[in-house]
Amino acid sequence: MAKSSMERYMKMLSLEPFADRDEMPVFQMMLASFGSLGGVLQTDLCASADKWIESIVRTISIIGKPDVCMPVCPGDTIFIMQLPARIPGRELPDDSLYQFVEKPYFTDPSEYQRILQMGWEAWSMQYVMSIQNPPYTNPGQLGARFAEFGANAGKTIGFIYSQGMVPDFDGACAPIFDTLSMTRSMADFAVDLMLDPGPIVDIMRRFQPAADEATIGQIKANNGTRVGGFVMRSSATFISPTLFEEIVWPVLKASIERFHAAGLTYILHADANWLPMLKYFTELPRGCVHVELDGSTDIEQAYDILRGYQSIRGDVPATMLAYGTPDEVADYCEKLIRMGMKGGFMLGSGCEVPLNAKAENVKAMIDALRA
């Protein structure tokens, strides 16, 4: 008898070997590509959670049903990313992919002292209001937008469960370190880390616990069990392993342990090269982290390091989904499946499925496990 998506997901988290390939879950991370595959314009996809749900229905009728689905629609992803954005139908053509624009929000490192004086919540609220287009002029506007975000998330997560799928996470957070990297901009932040990391460390240590507790409260209020951690600037692509060990890891480890104590699995979205950092995750409670790899990290080495400690997902390349053939996708998936049958593995795309992915290639990922 075929397993349900939730049964497959829980089997993966257990780290126990799979008895057969039907027990292994599959997750093609899709946001904008639901529109391109389902025939919905990107401008409509970004403007409406209902249109995004419609595009999911259309797409799974073509490619089949994955076990896991992203729970945040594109319009809300743009909002919660906390970067200025170019949006289809506004700055971009109607069917273009949305774009994030990274530029320094502050140019004087003394701003770190201002954050310490204001508090992280007040400062970040001010920042998010300023980057809207047009900028928000009062906190009520931001509160209304967060309320809309919550309503959309509830609607989307309810839909995902109604279809027998599992949402990738029930709520999400961006660690303060990574948010600071984006608001300061990568190059300037790297200089700050080398010249005077003290204020950055002070901000992280002082305010991260309260930020985590707020996220825990939101997720637990809705009976959630998973938190998405978008730790996108803590990899070896952006900082040295030494800086990771000295600055990032103590705070990140404490965060993950905090979520674990609250009964939440940490879904670590690990873009870029995490290979030098993965050994640290063996220090954590077994099975408390699920690591999503995008292809920049050697997945076989990652699996060898984390096997028996934490689960991983990956990593069919975006280029293969766009330009390859179903047979090439099937062969790549077969290699991953053979590796992952020892347990703790989810077959998935390497980060997001691209806008120009071929339907038959995305379908081949599901067929590799279910056909």
Predicted regions span which residues?
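Catalytic cores of TIM-barrel enzymes
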Residues: 1-371
